[in-house]
Regions:
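Extended substrate/RNA-proximal surfaces in nucleic-acid metabolism proteins
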Residues: 1-118, 123
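Charged catalytic cores and adjacent phosphate/nucleic-acid-binding surfaces used
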Residues: 94-95, 99-193
């Protein structure tokens, strides 16, 4: 139904705007066949691993290096199999993660290595993470995401980056506030945006 609707709108408005067929996907190895089918049908597949479940926890509720490793393993699996065109909010795992520790540094470096190896851009997300505002964590005050360490690693590895407006209210398209907040996190980094 989604595909038919988008293709119908593309045809109807072809003289006025370009409409592309795409969707945000999550990578679960048990769903490999469905993911491969979606990938063939879509012009764009955006990987958003925000609903991965790890021992009863979503990626918004990770608290240790082992859980971060599992999160990154899912991202690597998707990129290895060519299931995505870019990685949405690669740092969403930091939503409540308490501090920037060795597990975070390892995850950030691995995600940058994966991005560079498979030439899959990383999204600087201008949505939920910055809309909630700055929060106090054990070691600093920061947005839940984007998180600077991830994009320091991206810059060091020469990764491409994209800005993503992950918003759920069309009125938010009329403000640059959240874009500016997200860009403030990566200011001064030599990113290929």
């Amino acid at each position: 139904e989604y595909k038919a609707s988008v293709l119908s709108l593309r045809e109807k408005y072809r003289e006025q705007i370009d409409i592309h067929l795409g969707m945000e996907v999550e990578c679960y190895q048990s769903e490999w066949e469905d993911l491969a089918t979606y990938r063939k049908d879509m012009e764009y597949c955006i990987l958003g691993q925000h609903q991965i479940v790890l021992n009863g926890k979503s990626s918004y509720d990770l608290r240790n290096g082992d859980e971060l490793k599992q999160y990154v393993d899912q991202i690597e699996y998707a990129c290895y199999h060519g299931l995505c065109d870019y990685i949405a909010h690669p740092d969403a795992c930091m939503w409540i993660y308490p501090r920037i520790d060795d597990g975070v540094r390892t995850a950030a470096a691995r995600i940058a290595e994966i991005s560079a190896k498979y030439d899959v851009p990383l999204e600087i997300n201008c949505g939920s993470g910055v809309r909630t505002g700055l929060s106090q964590y054990e070691d600093c005050v920061r947005y839940p995401y984007p998180v600077c360490i991830f994009f320091e690693e991206a810059a060091a590895h020469g990764c491409r980056a994209v800005l993503g407006l992950d918003i759920h209210d069309p009125k938010l398209f009329f403000t640059d506030e959240y874009i500016n907040r997200a860009l403030s996190v990566v200011e001064g980094l030599d990113l290929n945006i």
